[in-house]
């Protein structure tokens, strides 16, 4: 359908206006990282959660982690990084050799998932 695309930063994204919910991308995803949204979005009245910058995804479309692109595009960290109680997640610019994430990648043994499938992963796991 053309709903899945790679943005200028290399992130795999979904255009919700083009997604028809056929789930072909879910079947093709080598990471099994996509889910189908079966329900209408529900927001509890008066509840404070989520990020207003994130578009609401309606029922019948695919979803996946975007590393909080709305936040990272504005220089903020993804919420999982910001909220991790163990500070076990680091987000940064791999093209900047002085960034914390680049230093960690150089100094530690970093692994990626499914690189052999040509996925060009941008998430690194460091021990």
PLM regions: where:
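Non-ligating segments of multi-cofactor redox enzymes
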Residues: 1-127
């Amino acid at each position: 359908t053309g709903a899945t695309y790679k943005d200028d930063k290399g992130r795999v994204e979904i255009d919700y206006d083009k997604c028809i919910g056929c789930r072909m991308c879910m079947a093709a995803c080598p990471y099994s990282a996509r889910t189908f949204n079966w329900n209408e979005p529900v927001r509890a009245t008066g509840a404070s959660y989520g990020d207003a910058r994130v578009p609401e995804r309606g029922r019948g479309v695919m979803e996946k982690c975007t590393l909080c692109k709305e936040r990272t595009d504005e220089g903020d960290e993804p919420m999982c990084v910001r909220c991790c109680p163990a500070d076990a997640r680091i987000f940064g610019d791999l093209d900047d050799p002085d960034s914390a994430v680049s230093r960690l990648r150089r100094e530690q043994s970093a692994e990626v998932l499914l690189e052999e499938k040509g996925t060009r992963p941008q998430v690194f796991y460091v021990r």
